[in-house]
Amino acid sequence: MASSRLLGDLSALQLSAELSKDSIVVLPLGAIEQHGQHLPLNTDFVVADAVSRAAVEKFGAETNAWLLPTLPFTNSNEHAWAAGTMWLSATTMMSVIDDIGRCVAATPAKKIMFINGHGGNSALMAMMNRELRLKYGLQTFLAHPHMPADQGGSSAESELGMGVHGGVDETSVMLHLRPDLVDMSLAVRRVPEGLAKNEQVKFGGRVAFGWLSNDFFPEGHIGDPTGASADLGSRMFAGAVESLGVAMKEISRFDFGR
């Protein structure tokens, strides 16, 4: 993307001139964690980084948005069992986000937008939205490139609403962005069909439950990547960029409905 929207490319003098209270500082959140046998560890990082860059490149000038580097390590303890998963404890991640919030608050900007590429961060980041609002007076926003299936997002029919991790959607986007890192010969359907029979205790149900990704299948993914395609990934990626653009426009004029 054009370096003009990268916050780190500004000098201290330029930052003071370019940023205002209505500027949006965008922080993408990635992850380095197991994604089954067919996807790379950096899947969430690749997606969060690419979609955030594309959105800020397209809508940054209009919305006065500035991009921070993508945070690679986040709260991935549901995958702690798998070698290669690099995760921060909830306490550490809260401290990191608090520190970043403090630094943003020291600039003229008073709005921070988190673009979260890892569903396991969602609950923690929703809490930090309010903490940063209370502690630093920032306007805080949490967006997702694609809403996780266990949080109300879409899922392929073959996934029974449980394309939670490494399923058709995520695999398709990676086939679009980094096909060289995807091994479709290892893609298999892994869906905990018994949960689909439950009324309340299930992904996205009224009753949440704690889980680790290997509670279900040894491969570590939950979904059906066998139907993934680069074409679907391209359409999903473009849709995510446009959706984030709408969000950025609304954030740029947000004032609690007053």
Predicted feature residues:
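Extended, histidine- and acidic-residue-enriched regions that form the cofactor-binding/catalytic faces
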Residues: 1-111, 119-258
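Conserved SAM-binding loop
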Residues: 114
